[in-house]
Amino acid sequence: MSLAKDHQGSATSSGKAPVYQVLAEDIRAMGIEAAFGLMSDDTALLATALDTAGVRFYGARHENTAITMAEGYAYTTGRIGVAVVGRGPALANGLHGAVYASRTGSPVLLIYGEAATSGRPNGLGPDYKAIDGVGVLRSAGLHTFTATSPQSARMALADAVANAAGGAAVSLHLPTNVQLAEIDRPREPLQVRHLERTPAPATTQSIEAATAVLTKASRPLILAGLGAHRAGARNAIQTLAEKIGALLVTTARGKDLFCGNPYNLGIIGSFSHSIARRMAEQADCVLVFGASLNFLTTSFGTSLPRVPLIQVDAVRSNISRWLNADVALVGDARLVAEQLLAALPARSETKPFHDEATRRLISGFDPARDFQAANTARTLDPRTLAIELEELLPRDRHLVVDSGNFLSVVPYLSVPDPGCFKMTADFASIGLGFGAALGVAKARPEKTTVLVIGDGGFLMTMGELETVVREDLPMVIVLMNDCAYGAELHFLRLRQQPVAKSVFPDVDFAPIAEGFGFEAATIRTLEDLHKVAPRLRKPDGPIFLDCKINADVAAPFMSEFAHFEGRH
């Protein structure tokens, strides 16, 4: 670990100023340029001061969205995402997003308007907004910091920022009386020192152990996740795969990392195509870089063969979290790949996976022929829809997906690299995608952000249509509307239970989106989609597609979960 360079806080000047103003200036001087929130009486002054100081305040229509906006911004930029929410009911509204943010590993600073430290906040009686904000946010997984006095407020901010910068969600609690108190303007900039992880290689002993296993393998499979992308390991891993004759697969979060490689099988697990599954089953060793091997990557333990497993991760606790690794390599993905390249002997030309037949099989694969399309007169198979959208949407895009049964579309929509793809399933819930997409769109306005969301998650966050138009965000919203809670529908159906309560009327959302200022269309057939193709290729303003999809199409993980449940 090495010390990162100090951040410096607000410019100094003479006189006094309220704490909220000093903190706003400190935050801007740290290089933070955006904050997301929904004003409350205990945060309105701070939000206004932030905006005045040059930290653009983006107002959301719900606290849950404000927090997920900050997380989406942080995920995309690698910089601290700031959310500002009030206490009591505002925190209750935002708790869903707070738990989610704490599980993503993104650097998020949640500034919380806390009750006054003494007396009755309203001066009249019981505080109707009373809630244990510190206790609630700690239980949500956040590290909490409180400004207990006007004099300690700047140090509390410095500590919170330092912890967030390390890849954590933290909360800074600012009691109203502390915010309003006047203090001397600082004579010195605020110093924020934080530890920055220095990429480290694996130990010699672990490299030797991995080399011994790989040398014996004739059909190795290399699996890479988002961690490999963030480590910049793509080229080193591809060179290693060429040396040892390995096929390449990724997790869903690492999708398209090896796009263009002749031995790339795409995603492994619940989002695999048939060739990937068939080829992966033939592997006699699996080498994993920067992936947790969760239940979607392993299809509940069925997608990877029972062969020696070598797992590489920069964080020791991530190894063997889901599957037991035979060899653990604790180190940076790129450095470890380079170590293995140097340690492994040159292999003969006999590489069973690297032959002309394999290359032809992979290059000739047509995803549209990998399933029986289930289009009807008034609905589309979501997979067919996604294959068409792949050709119509701008290539240089960010893709954000909410959660739900419609996630079967993930393998059919590509991105330039894994950093342009954002899943929001870290809390296994729906309703988080819209906020994350707003944050991504703000972070990267030069690209079109495509949000794919189900009707259930959309209805939870529909008010943010106004935010998209107000902030002029470059977005295309693809509503996968099966008129149902699709995951629950198939959960019930797979257990031979009645599904009526999971199904809803067919509502046309396009006119609603038009009322907010979107270009909108209802899509029931491919002909409907082709009519809007010119606008999709070069969007000029936000676009909303209410895509009516066939609710009978189940995502693969629905049946996988049912089978897993049956075995246990």
Predicted region positions:
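Glycine-rich, anion-gripping cofactor-binding loops and their flanking helix/strand elements
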Residues: 75, 93, 226-310, 416-447, ...
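Thiamine diphosphate
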Residues: 107, 118-129, 320-322, 328-330, ...
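Phosphate/pyrophosphate-binding active-site segments
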Residues: 2-15, 148-151, 171-174, 186, ...
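Conformationally flexible catalytic loops at phosphate/diphosphate-handling active centers
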Residues: 14-15, 131, 159-216, 370
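Active-site diphosphate/adenylate-binding microenvironment
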Residues: 20-24, 28-31, 38-41, 45-51, ...
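A short, small-residue-rich loop immediately preceding and capping a beta-strand
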Residues: 33-36, 56-58, 76-113, 223-226, ...
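Glycine-rich, acidic loop regions that bind phosphate or pyrophosphate groups
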Residues: 3-7, 112-156, 174, 253-357
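Glycine-rich phosphate/diphosphate-binding loops that line cofactor/substrate pockets in enzymes
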Residues: 22-33, 72-78, 161-166, 206-220, ...
